[in-house]
Amino acid sequence: GTTLLRDLLRLHPHLECPEETHFFRWPDPYASPRFMHPYTQNKFIKKQREMDGISEQEFIHLIETSNSRSELAEAYGNLFLKKQNNPHGRWFDKTPQNIYGILLISRLMPDSRFIHIHRNPLNVVASLLQGKVLSATGITDAISYWCEAMVIMNEYKRIAAYRVLEVSYEHLTSDPLGSMITILEFLEEDPDDYVLPDKFVHGEHNKYLDTLSEQQIKEVKQRCRPYYSMYGYE
């Protein structure tokens, strides 16, 4: 769902999004060896920077001149805007694992806003078990991806609900324009500047019906409580 939302947001002329930055993904202290390792050694992350048009030399300079995750993120985002020839635009990050760093993001980037896109856990689990984008080794960790994110988000909403907009993947795909108008208003971006091409979004296909057994479906529904019903999937 984050990729679709990213693609929809980037249709607005003021909004730009790099590939997933992962700057708030891991809990290790900023600039520590364990924090730095994936950014210097992970081929996938380095490839994403290449796709953003940011060279290794440029990234090293950003690291050397940043004293925190937020400084690095801001510097990276601003450089990316220049690479996109949109220096006065606004950048955002779609890294799904930002959920694990939401408290740090919230404190270090006080003007940030969060869009929580949620999807029927049955389809999430089915997708993770297929492993085309992100994979799970079994149904337990597949369910945990959904449940742990829900726990964190609902606890965060108790602190700063006004900074969060929750968007249903199912509603986004059934009424993309209406959903995007709501999202853009939340972000204080002008919906009049937004144009959605025809057939840009396809509806939810409920692939879990062809992927999960009856027992697995029952297990997902049971273990995803109470959020399964709270979010209208009952």
Task: Indicate residue ranges for each PLM-predicted region.
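Soluble or luminal CAZymes and related metallo-dependent hydrolases
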Residues: 68-75, 94-97, 141-149, 175, ...
